Amino acid sequence: MKSKYHFFIVAFLLVGLCSNAQFVKKHGQLSVKGTQLVDKNQNPIVLRGVSFGWHSMWPRFYNAKAVDWLKKDFNCTVVRAALGIEIGEYPYLKATEFSKEKLEAVVKGAIKSDIYVIIDWHSHNINLQEAKVFF
């Protein structure tokens, strides 16, 4: 009887641990319905995540290892990659290729970790033409 009880406890814990294992695969493309974020099946969904600081000021954190760590240790289902446009040592307007490399590292890390990523065009000015080209 004890072994059966232990089996169910372990099984329950494993289900809980694996619930975010394939988060994007499970929920697919997200959209907004009214005021609610919904998944591919129109079911309400809540994302939990962390924001990276601007890539132009803290580029050392823009890598797949950091994304994986955030997923595992913080149980993130989304990360925000803030692309610094004008400010910092390597802003997008002055170091475009470097900026794209840093952003791509986070995006690839999110894909590998099966979590969502929000790309933030973080600009204190409009830079509309540059934003159109980027997106």
Task: Report residues per predicted region.
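Active-site mouth of glycoside hydrolases
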Residues: 23-135
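Bacterial Sec-dependent N-terminal signal peptides
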Residues: 1-22
